[in-house]
Amino acid sequence: MSLLLEPSPTMIKEQKMYRDMGLTDEEFAMIERILGRLPNYTETGIFSVMWSEHCSYKNSKPVLKKFPTEGKHVLQGPGEGAGIVDIGDGLAVAFKIESHNHPSAIEPYQGAATGVGGIIRDVFSMGARPIALLNSLRFGELTSPRVKYLFERVVAGIAGYGNCVGIPTVGGEVQFDAAYEGNPLVNAMCVGVIRHEDIQKGIASGVGNTVMYVGAKTGRDGIHGATFASEELTEQSEQKRPAVQVGDPFMEKLLLEACLEVIHCDALVGMQDMGAAGLTSSSAEMASKAGSGIELNLDLVPQRETGMTPYEMMLSESQERMLLVVKKGREQEIMDVFSKYGLEAKAIGRVTDDHMLRLYHRGEVVAEIPVDALAKDAPVYHKPSQEPAYYREFQTMEYVPTVDNYEETLLALLSQPTIASKEWVYEQYDYMVRTNTVVAPGSDAAVLRIRGTNKALAMTTDCNSRYVYLDPEVGGKIAIAEAARNIVCSGAQPLAVTDCLNFGNPEKPEIFWQLEKAVDGMSEACRILETPVISGNVSLYNETNGEAIYPTPIVGMVGIVEHVDHITTQAFKQPGDLIYIIGEAKQEFGGSELQKWLTGRIFGKAPTIDLHVEVKRQQQLLTAIRAGVVASAHDVSEGGLAVALAECVMSAQGLGARVEMKGDVVAELFSETQSRFIVSVKKEHQQMFERLVQAVRIGEVTNDGTLHVTAEDTCILHVPVETMRNVWKGAIPCLLKSKD
């Protein structure tokens, strides 16, 4: 589109063309008042992306304020590219999780790949070297041809990008439920390490300083990507494929290394990724944070397509681009660094003192907007909230299953895609590149050593969205608690949280109620577990033709292993070790894998959780691990104790377990009661372990390669470990190969 063909401000208003960009009538009227005139086409587009939910959090901001964001280790909370936490020795860890759901539903390979690329840039824009990637994925049932296609292409996209950049993908989770049939979730997390003195911020300060553009040239891909991410998916969404960006991981690698070198150059003032809303968001946000203004000459923006308009250049979300602010007169120093990597750093503007975003094109001013109106003063909506009818109904329902054949039930649960081995997924990822990975994918948390120290980092992503659906507040608490449980089982102290809040349309009161209650639960858990929220992302409008996903607040958590000797895994270690269970089982089957397998649906009450009990048990276990008396540790989660035991023996080689159950055997084996751990201990450490931890001994590790469970001196389950392993490992590959 040429400038001559762009609609006039009057046409935009009279024909309500702004609605197609995602703006409401009231918002357009606000823009008129802010500018004191009608906005032109470029300005309307700029407001539309910056006031989208994806960029402004206009629907979720009142809820997000509930999160605790400060703590003794926090160096940088929400508001920058990533949060940062101190880990001692002058080092810090930077991390963040973000969604790329809508693009992945339309073009799964590039949608997932560019999600990885974007989160990597968020971390290295802070000055941190990315050391690990994780992801949290949700798909519909794996029996659907469409779901198989999305699953295979999303995993390929994550692998293709991460492997090429050379950052190990070390962990994550994949779950399958019909609620995600039309709207998969692709949440990507990146973790980086940084020295305190190298921390950068995305600010445009210093009047007269130069604004520089670095990285890939600007094309028309991703235009209105932020707006696209702020609306429901429909049958027409497939036509918006151009809104999905295309990534180049080799360019990303060069950009990463160049940016990590340039942070040591005194000429650099600030640096930010051109992510959602591209050049618009990076320039406006950097100026707003600094209390300055910014002028850009769009004729100087590197373009890979001819005839691009200001609207297209400002709204493009082409990947692998960074915006830098550099001290005036020292541009050559910056250019020399990037030139070493075959990259061009180009001056495209300057910092001003008038708090305006001013754009020039062909010698004319084509946009003039107050930066705070874009970056800080978007409208904020306090949406109505209403408890859904299903929730009241579920609170009155009791579900107590009957199990006739324990072996058949365990093998059936191990074959459920959500529980089954994800080896098919993570074997496509290079999780050992850079050789720092100590605990690879498949355990409670991934663990990476920190070179030059005796410390290590544990990291995980977690959320059982079924629990959040049944009871958002309780489910929110459990999401935080389970993440911390996984960190502790690895021998680490939980430090902080990054979250990705994936929900449906917030304009529906029942959906907003889910969001509000989930955040209430998460916030309470974060306060009690002392894990502040330091970064995150909100992804709303996850609906397909009016049907919402399960509310899915993904929790990314990082913990510190004070000494590598404390690193613990779930695998049983040697015959004769004693097996303990921490925590008692209750008849809690709402949202459980057993309920889904037996009934084909999810209903009833979510498991309860006492956060003070949770903290006490985690602290006791971590103390025992640090005392060197724990051989293995694993949390009891999906599928209950039976599945947890199976995972402990399947993770070992040639070992088995003999366990005695007492009380309600179905609840003991298959209930998903919270705050429970399965631990193995050497016999010589028995007394010290029992002094440190309240736990019940239930059996011991054997060398016969079977899982043997008795109740009242009667064998109720006797399964060869190899049989379990074959079912568990083969489930997902078999489903992918099956013809529907």
From Swiss-Prot:
Protein family (similarity comment): Belongs to the FGAMS family.
Gene name as annotated: purL
PANTHER family tied to this protein: PHOSPHORIBOSYLFORMYLGLYCINAMIDINE SYNTHASE SUBUNIT PURL (PTHR43555:SF1)
Task of the protein: Part of the phosphoribosylformylglycinamidine synthase complex involved in the purines biosynthetic pathway. Catalyzes the ATP-dependent conversion of formylglycinamide ribonucleotide (FGAR) and glutamine to yield formylglycinamidine ribonucleotide (FGAM) and glutamate. The FGAM synthase complex is composed of three subunits. PurQ produces an ammonia molecule by converting glutamine to glutamate. PurL transfers the ammonia molecule to FGAR to form FGAM in an ATP-dependent manner.
Binding site for Mg(2+) 1: 98, 537
Main location: cytoplasm
Residues annotated as catalytic: 54, 100 (proton acceptor)
Subcellular location as annotated: Cytoplasm
Chain positions recorded as substrate binding sites: 99-102, 121, 245, 317-319, 539
Binding site for ATP: 57, 96, 499, 536
Native source organism of the sequence: Anoxybacillus flavithermus (strain DSM 21510 / WK1)
InterPro entries in alphabetical order: PRibForGlyAmidine_synth_PurL, PurL_linker, PurM-like_C_dom, PurM-like_C_sf, PurM-like_N, PurM-like_N_sf
Name used for this protein in its record: Phosphoribosylformylglycinamidine synthase subunit PurL
Enzyme kind, highest EC tier: ligase
Annotated pathway: Purine metabolism; IMP biosynthesis via de novo pathway; 5-amino-1-(5-phospho-D-ribosyl)imidazole from N(2)-formyl-N(1)-(5-phospho-D-ribosyl)glycinamide: step 1/2
Biological process (GO), any one: 'de novo' IMP biosynthetic process
Binding site for Mg(2+) 2: 122, 273
Recorded GO CC terms: cytoplasm
An annotated Gene Ontology molecular function: magnesium ion binding
Keyword entries, A-Z: ATP-binding, Cytoplasm, Ligase, Magnesium, Metal-binding, Nucleotide-binding, Purine biosynthesis
UniProt entry tagged with the keyword Metal-binding: yes
Enzyme Commission numbers on file: 6.3.5.3
Keyword ATP-binding: yes
